[in-house]
Amino acid sequence: MGARSVDTTFDVGIVGGGPAGLSAAIWSARYLHSVVVVDSGDPRNWETRRINGFLGFEGIRPADLRASGRDLCRGLGVELIDAIVLRVEHEGEEDFALCLEGGGRVHARRLLLAIGIRDVWPDLPGLAHVYGANAHVCPDCDGFESRGKKIVVIGNGRRAVGMALNLTTWTDDIIICTNGRPPELDEQEYCDKLDALNIPVLTERIETVCYEGTSIHCLKLADGMQLDTDKVFFTIGQYPADDLCAKLGCERDDEGHVIVDEHGHTSVHNAFAAGDITPGPQLAIKAAAQGATAALAIHKSLVPESRKLAPRKHAVSSR
């Protein structure tokens, strides 16, 4: 469905159709709310071969999980719009308008931002050919499949050190390569931990990833050295998939993640967030759980006060 205006004001408007957004849509619909999901169709894990550790769906392809979620949404009456949201505007004191590319508008009483994030990729020939199979960005997601393997972490500074330390859960054969960038190991703690775990740091620029099919043979460095490895993990940086959250005024951390409470509330009234756009581990199953949690909070915010009990007052014991 293309960008268009919708006359209805939905109870719940969701931006993003990944695990967080679809999970929130499913649960909001189960509470009999009218729900719309607007999705750009450009997920972060576009080339990932499988999702690991998702209860009941081990090894499912991300596209298949999304398709299954969309089918379930349709069965529950959720409106699915394939479009890009350019901005979100306030309508009155309570509602929102989702302004779509092409001029359409969608109206909602509550907003869930599940837009995800994007990874900064190193400019490295051959990397795209092995991404999702033997090149990764998430040790939590793909560390188990890397157990006992030779791994090169591409990155520098705290990010690279943290990723390398995380990967020691599964292997002790790790090298950090900064790909020509300064190491930025300014804190003695970084050097001490890397030295104790025998993790060397190379600063030479990588010329190319040598591969066959989806298997990596080595990384060819600018000085002619060939760095043997089985897998590559890279951590150059991340950024929000778009600037909707910033434009709306949501409070964010230093890396651009939207700060939420345990129920998914953002700093903006009636606006919620879930999934990778929020701080913490970036796992599909966590995103889905956050979406469900946010849906419950959204439902409670939509229930009239006449259908709620007053909060229970807890007695304070005296000693």
Predicted features along the sequence, with ranges:
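Active-site glycine-rich loop that binds ribose-phosphate moieties when present
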Residues: 133-141, 150-163, 184-185
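Beta1-alpha1 glycine-rich phosphate/pyrophosphate-binding loop at the start
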Residues: 3-4, 10-67, 159-184
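Residue-level detector of alpha-helix initiation sites
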Residues: 18-20, 117-119, 158-159, 278
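A Rossmann-like FAD-binding core segment of flavoenzymes
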Residues: 67-100, 105-107, 171-258, 303-319
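Glycine/Thr-rich phosphate-binding loops of Rossmann-like dinucleotide-binding domains
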Residues: 121-122, 162, 229, 242-243, ...
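A conserved FAD-binding loop/helix module that cradles the flavin
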Residues: 25, 161-163, 274-319
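FAD-site-proximal beta/loop scaffold in flavoenzymes
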Residues: 2, 129-145, 236-285, 293, ...
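FAD-binding core/adjacent interface of flavoenzyme oxidoreductases
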Residues: 1-13, 78-149, 231-233, 258-262, ...
